[in-house]
Amino acid sequence: MTLPRSEISAGDAVVFDAVSKRFPASGGNTAFTALDNVSLAVARGSITGIIGRSGAGKSTLIRLVNGLEKPSSGKVFVDGVDVGALDEAGLRDLRRSVGMIFQHFNLLSSRTVFGNVALPLEIAGMDRRAIEQRVRPLLELVGLADKHGRYPAELSGGQKQRIGIARALATEPKLLLSDEATSALDPETTQSILELLRRINAELGLTVLLITHEMEVVKAVTSDVAVIDKGEIVERGHTFDVFTHSRHETTRALLSGLAGSKLPEAVARGLKPAAASGDRVVVRLTFFGAAAERPLISQLIQSVGAEVNIIAGTIDEIGGKPYGSLVVAYGADAETSGKAERFFTENGLVTEVLGYVA
């Protein structure tokens, strides 16, 4: 699915307009298509996530934004400027307005925390006093003011990523690109980095374009998300809407890996595509809003008049809105299934039949 041109606004921070990227193959083989006719707008001031499996085209997409790659066809606009039309001087100016953080921190081991953050300012020719005035507040912002004289080897992974974030902000960019920036971090550190990105977005009004393969990251911090698969945008929208009304199988597969939503291995192994006599149907329920605060399972049991087993589940918030996912099993016979389906419809639940178990 691509973004209709009528939905592309001149006020967007980044616009991909019918972008394709093909890499030549060796030995006369067919060229590899990394991106296929991608159209997408990134709203100014948003935290937008691009999520997909490894090899889906995420990193290629983000490299087009700062001109590290050029599209084979289509155009990429940053603040209304056609990136592909820029000369070398124009690209240098663009890259000063676009910060980037990576999975691997790319710090210089011979430089202190202060020295690493100051590096892009030194390259830009800024004088020492101005560098000091710029770097000190950034170290305060990322919580490393007391570590300014330390070296990377003395710091944790999370602290190293904070240096990377401060360095990316040193040139006062309007846009921050994050390429799997939390993938090498433990869950607790990941949450602290995501909270920092959220605070930077709010306090500096910075647009953040975040590349990840983790739905937990998308859920925690983004306002909008696009799902990419085999070089195509297959689903996009506000994060809450994509989570609660996912339409594409790739999105559903990524959502199934969220904590509390994943099937126990024994159940997953026993799933069948069709029901036999006496089997139970396994259904994933997605509920939100007022439904997330009601005793739905007890009401479901009363409605169907039969046993309902809870296999997995989670209740959380996305963008301050309550959201829940439950995997349940109940009789696959026509009477029980019919009553359950009516209950789901009447209560506005989104359902997905996962299969059948004995």
UniProtKB/Swiss-Prot annotation:
The answer on whether this UniProt entry bears the keyword Cell inner membrane reads yes
What the entry lists under InterPro entries is as follows: AAA+_ATPase (IPR003593), ABC_transporter-like_ATP-bd (IPR003439), ABC_transporter-like_CS (IPR017871), ACT-like_dom_sf (IPR045865), MetN_ABC (IPR041701), MetN_ABC_transporter-like (IPR050086), NIL_domain (IPR018449), P-loop_NTPase (IPR027417)
Reactions catalysed, as given in the entry: L-methionine(out) + ATP + H2O = L-methionine(in) + ADP + phosphate + H(+); D-methionine(out) + ATP + H2O = D-methionine(in) + ADP + phosphate + H(+)
What Gene Ontology cellular component terms go with this record? plasma membrane
Q: How does it sit in the membrane?
A: Peripheral membrane protein
UniProt domain ABC transporter: residue ranges? 14-255
Described by its record, this protein's role is as follows: Part of the ABC transporter complex MetNIQ involved in methionine import. Responsible for energy coupling to the transport system.
Protein name as it appears in the record = Methionine import ATP-binding protein MetN
What is the name of the gene encoding this protein?
A: metN
